[in-house]
């Protein structure tokens, strides 16, 4: 019975004169999301409302699933649109709506009328009362409950038509991707970084990604795991450019030249340097990591300060105060968890010291990095010049 979806947004409504930029971006993303499905949809914007209307038969569950992955959507409301053919016709159509939408009539309800068309000849209170009466007359087993109803029947009286809906499906929230700049995600095969990318994309940021590969110490299966995680993030964030950096020579050279308790922090600093270079090439305005304070030795406050010192771009860490279980729950929600726990090691887990430093000194790290001489710069440039680019589609 539903061929139209009312799509609500939240934060976008708080924008000022540039609100149309966010609305247009959201309309575009909704259109792109539905275009991949069977069935033709038109997506329109009208007076603070966005409508997606089907021109032919479609899979209802597929549509809901697709829309729940579009950032910027606060709620999805399957609805019917009625022509304004008079008050008696509205009463008859409401009874028809309830009859089709709710086969089991044992429920409590409330009618909630929004009179956007101020010229409508009846007040909201009158419509609430009169529609409630016809529902009770038609279906005596129903009951009115204005405080905690099972069904909230929304009636929007607009200038050209009347919208009726009672199901409100939560959307992902956030802002439309692409309305808030571009940033580079340091993506590994773990649980955290895909979640970090998801969360920053939710704030409207276009995501690119960099993965550090260390063959033969990391396998092609480890690389494919990261590609699969990028695909999962792309379902929400849209297309992602994935840079695959061969980090083997850099990693081995650091391992040979530097104290082993500092390996992780020094390797991390060079990863940040390379990611920043790639970010600047593509006009990214920041880096994104999945770090959370105290989770591992390289994520203590002292370690993060030393890592940050190597960057000129801002580093966004959306998981910084999260417990691991909170991160896992988001990973499961975006269907990344089962892939993240596949047992293929990445370069961050192979060259790990038994007793890594947890309170590194920036001066000490600087002195130890001097041992790497000019050769490390050559290795970095080679890694940047030989990057493999994989374009990930949603």
What are these regions (language model features)?
Residues 335-343:
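A short alpha-helix-loop-beta-strand transition element characteristic
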Residues 1-184, 194-240, 309, 357-362, ...:
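RNA-binding accessory domains that recognize and position tRNA/RNA substrates
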Residues 230-256, 346:
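A conserved beta-strand->alpha-helix junction
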Residues 185, 209-211, 244, 289, ...:
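Structural beta-sheet core signal
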Residues 133-135, 168, 173-180, 251-252, ...:
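Active-site adenylate/phosphate-handling loop in enzymes that bind or generate adenylated species
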Residues 295, 343-351:
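Small/polar glycine-rich anion-binding or flexible loop at a beta-alpha turn
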Residues 190:
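Conserved G/P- and acidic residue-centered "switch" motifs that form tight phosphate/ATP-binding loops
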């Amino acid at each position: 019975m539903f061929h139209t979806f009312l799509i609500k947004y939240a934060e976008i409504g708080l924008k000022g004169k540039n609100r149309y930029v966010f609305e247009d971006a959201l309309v575009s993303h909704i259109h792109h999301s539905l275009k991949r499905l069977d069935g033709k949809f038109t997506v329109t914007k009208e007076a603070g409302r966005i409508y997606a209307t089907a021109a032919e038969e479609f899979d209802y569950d597929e549509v809901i699933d697709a829309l729940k992955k579009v950032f910027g959507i606060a709620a999805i409301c399957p609805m019917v649109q009625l022509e304004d053919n008079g008050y008696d016709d509205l009463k008859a159509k409401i009874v028809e709506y309830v009859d089709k939408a709710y086969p089991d009539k044992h429920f409590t309800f409330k009618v909630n009328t929004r009179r956007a068309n101020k010229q409508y000849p009846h007040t909201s209170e009158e419509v609430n009362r009169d529609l409630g009466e016809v529902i009770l007359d038609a279906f005596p087993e129903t009951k009115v409950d204005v405080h905690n109803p099972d069904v909230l029947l929304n009636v929007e009286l607009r200038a050209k038509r009347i919208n009726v809906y009672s199901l409100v499906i939560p959307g992902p929230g956030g802002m439309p991707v692409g309305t808030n700049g571009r940033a580079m995600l340091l993506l590994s095969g773990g649980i955290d970084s895909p979640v970090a990318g998801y969360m920053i994309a939710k704030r409207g940021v276009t995501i690119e990604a960099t993965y550090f590969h260390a063959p033969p110490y990391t396998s092609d299966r480890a690389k494919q795991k990261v590609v699969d995680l990028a695909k999962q993030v792309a379902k929400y964030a849209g297309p992602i450019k994935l840079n695959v950096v061969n980090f083997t020579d850099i990693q081995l050279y650091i391992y040979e030249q530097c104290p082993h308790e500092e390996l992780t922090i020094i390797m991390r600093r060079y990863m940040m340097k390379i990611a920043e270079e790639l970010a600047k090439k593509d006009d990214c305005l920041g880096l994104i990591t999945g770090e959370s304070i105290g989770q591992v030795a390289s994520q203590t406050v002292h370690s993060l300060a030393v890592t940050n010192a190597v960057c000129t771009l801002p580093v966004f860490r959306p998981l910084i105060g999260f417990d691991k279980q909170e991160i896992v729950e988001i990973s499961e929600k975006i269907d990344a968890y089962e892939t993240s726990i596949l047992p293929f090691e990445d370069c961050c887990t192979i060259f790990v010291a038994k007793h890594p430093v947890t309170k590194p000194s920036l001066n000490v790290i600087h002195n130890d990095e001097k041992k790497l001489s000019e050769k490390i710069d050559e290795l970095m440039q080679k890694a940047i010049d030989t990057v493999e680019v994989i374009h990930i589609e949603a």
